[in-house]
Amino acid sequence: FGLNLSRLDIRQEAARHYKLITSVCKKLGIADYSKLSEEAKIKFLSKEYKSRRPLIPQNIKLDADDRETWTTFKMISESPRECLGAYVISMASNVSDILVVMLLQKEAGIKSCLRIVPLFETLSDLQNSHIVMESLFKHSWYVNYFKKNQEIMIGYSDSSKDAGKFAASWAQYCAQEKLGNIATKYKIKLTLFHGRGGSVGRGGGPVYAALLSQPPGTVNARTRVTEQGEVIQQKYGSESLAEYSLGTYIGAVLEATLSPPIQPKKKWRNLMDEMSILSSESYRGYLNNNKNFLRYFDEITPKNILDKLYIGSRPSKRKKSQDIKDLRAIPWVFAWTQIRLVLPAWLGTTEALQLASRGKNKLILKDMLYRWPFFYEMMDMLDMILTKTNQRVIEYYEECLADNDLKKIGRNLRKNLSLLIDLNKKLIPSHILNQRKEFRKSILIRDTYAEILNLLQANIMLRLSKKNIDRKQKEILMEAMIVTISGISAAMKNTG
């Protein structure tokens, strides 16, 4: 009938487009696209986009992955334009990642191209995002096609998994700031799209504080934010809740636009740079320099059981491998939250705050805390996460499921967590801690019930690990496991 409600965004990983165009070039005998330099790729893609001659034959034979990618573009060309929004490129890192989507849209016969939204996710991609976008904005044919409008998505989940929450938060802030400056330079109307999850480790947290802590001049009366399935009910489950949530967004966007936060001082930036480097090195050291760390994650958390349950809309891994890099951020965060370690939200921060607690840094930190909304919100989220951790529960999981090697890793992690809790109490003024304590009361109440579910979950995992259980027992235990997962998630609130 020609009616449509909300528009659907299309999302695909940059590697899939790269693989498709490489296959096409190989089959047509044009060039080995994979061996071209970035400059040569840009030149080739621009030339083919402007050419009236089609590049991809209608009857081209492709493998299953390439056929799926190409079929998506063909489907877009056959769908009403009013039903579709943006084309999001996940794991974007180069100008060619963006231009190849322009070319594929043209080749598929899409008359009015979907706006292209690069999603910068890893730490290095965030740090280089302004260089990529400035290079793109120099191509007038691209800029003019979209009438000087550009949407850019900031990845919170994978950058945190890649470098740790502290370093990722600072990289996200700097990336937005630089992207805003580049957009102003080229007179581009920029919309930042925040790919936040429900958990702090994936960029979650109170909306108002998050928007008011963005770099000055980057909101400009518009924003886009992802809302996770787990929070839709609590934010939009009734008319009054929906009105309140939308009102919060509108109020925060207006305030951030009309009364933006102050520019961070140079000494604040310098300290954040030092803390960020130290935090990232520490986080990656824990993950990469201990051969048993991945085994600890596999055996102590319910990660392997989560893989078998129908939770979430995407597979838990991008590829079939044992590498943490290939694990999606959602199960990574979810599994650590279940055992109450909530590791992705704080690991690496201890070392950063130890640096900030020395000498003159302590005064700079205090200044940042009182005068910089970004840093205040960052520390507020850290305090909330520390309240949700439970070291007795973590130790119980280890008693049930860990061998001596894994218990050693657990002791080191809990020691690091204890140091961070003490640092947080020493560095944050007592009146702020007392104020936060009032807001955390509901967490402590829910914790009483969550502890029981955690003890049950650890015992269920132990019984499921036995080889001599029959099929009926396994079914009963899996049902009980789902109940504990749901209950702990409800108690923790922001989990995925």
Enumerate the predicted regions with their spans.
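Conserved, mostly hydrophobic/aromatic
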Residues: 2, 118, 198
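Acidic, glycine-enriched catalytic cores built around paired aspartates
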Residues: 9-11, 16-18, 30-58, 65-73, ...
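Acidic, His- and aromatic-enriched active-site or binding-groove loops in soluble protein domains
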Residues: 24-38, 110-115, 140-146, 211-229
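Conserved radical SAM core fold
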Residues: 119-126, 155-162
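Catalytic cores of alpha/beta
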Residues: 128-134, 202-210
